[in-house]
Amino acid sequence: MAEKRNIFLVGPMGAGKSTIGRHLAQMLHLEFHDSDQEIESRTGADIAWVFDVEGEEGFRNRETQVVADLTEKQGIVLATGGGSIQSKEIRNNLSARGIVVYLETTIDKQVARTQRDKRRPLLQVDDPREVLENLAEVRNPLYEEIADVIVKTDEQSAKVVANQIIEQLGF
């Protein structure tokens, strides 16, 4: 596995992809990228605005392009958006261009970690738990399908999880 120098983090909202990714990149002396932040940088607007103006399809099109561009880089850690996994093109790019690490977490942890975050358009509903459960049903099999490594993030700090990833990858 060590021949692939890119590490791509996938998983649901609230799994810790961005936080763990920053630690991982720092520990491995790699560049860190977050696909959502890159979309915001390119559009000059936040994700919620892109969803409002362009809808989910417009956002997903932007996400596909951003992930395609970022996965062509070498020596990066990339935190992907939770829904990016639903794109076959993104799954193919992630699998072909790096090591895919699935950060697995429970619905309870997702709810706890995302409940105050107003920047998550899909969760701005009366029952975010139901949304997260429905998303998990669709997305979890896709995360598992492309994962080279699966790491649970529920009860551990981001730094501990980053260390576990490094150990599992043999870096």
From Swiss-Prot:
GO cellular component: cytosol
Pfam families linked: SKI
Pathway participation: Metabolic intermediate biosynthesis; chorismate biosynthesis; chorismate from D-erythrose 4-phosphate and phosphoenolpyruvate: step 5/7
Chief location: cytoplasm
UniProtKB keywords: Amino-acid biosynthesis, Aromatic amino acid biosynthesis, ATP-binding, Cytoplasm, Kinase, Magnesium, Metal-binding, Nucleotide-binding, Transferase
Reaction(s) catalysed (UniProt annotation): shikimate + ATP = 3-phosphoshikimate + ADP + H(+)
Residues at which substrate binds: 36, 60, 82, 139
Signal peptide: none
GO biological process terms held by the UniProt record: amino acid biosynthetic process; aromatic amino acid family biosynthetic process; chorismate biosynthetic process
Cofactor requirements of the protein: Mg(2+)
UniProt-listed Enzyme Commission number(s): 2.7.1.71
Localization annotation: Cytoplasm
UniProt keyword Iron-sulfur present: no
Cofactor binding, note field: Binds 1 Mg(2+) ion per subunit.
Binding residues for ATP: 14-19, 120, 156
GO molecular function annotation: ATP binding; magnesium ion binding; shikimate kinase activity
Chain positions recorded as Mg(2+) binding sites: 18
Top-level lineage group: Bacteria
Keyword Amino-acid biosynthesis: yes
Task of the protein: Catalyzes the specific phosphorylation of the 3-hydroxyl group of shikimic acid using ATP as a cosubstrate.
Family in the record: Belongs to the shikimate kinase family.
Subunit structure, as described in the record: Monomer.
Protein's name in the database: Shikimate kinase
Organism: Shewanella halifaxensis (strain HAW-EB4)
Gene name linked to the record: aroK
